[in-house]
């Protein structure tokens, strides 16, 4: 399978961070973005190192009433084919709904595939900083018995395109502020519709070119 280049990991991190800041296109959201790191909430679930949350995100989870957008990173683990330790990044949206916060987690896999306790551990960490219960809504799994794995056509020798996917979902959210007016149930329906449409586009050619072309065009490369 041929892949388009440059790969996101071949682009300077500061350029990826700059694009993330550039996509802050709606004042309906609060953007808890670390100016020095692509990831704002970092979970080191593989070796048990304590999580690291950007100070601006910790403050926003507790005090900001607007929906908060940030990027979450976590460990996938060692990959023998790539001879590398793989990490993953996910665009995340925290919304106060009732007496709790729902974090809409625009991932592409079931977190139980990483670890049975991973989701509950992340929820506990976010809740600690928010001061209220936090529930993680895995966007890949809202409307199907089997989660939608949007990276299934990337091939065994590729990693890092999650950098592009995080920007894709960020642009979707900032370009669709009406999403925030929906009920929690209707938010899930809108997410399921988005994932289904993207999944169909991926499935027709059975390639990873959708996100590759998106990222390269977005970055002007």
Report residues per predicted region.
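Charged/polar, solvent-exposed surface patches and flexible loops
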Residues: 55, 59, 120-128, 213
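C-terminal folded domains that constitute the principal catalytic or ligand-binding module
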Residues: 138-220
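Cysteine protease-like catalytic core of ubiquitin/ubiquitin-like
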Residues: 64-174
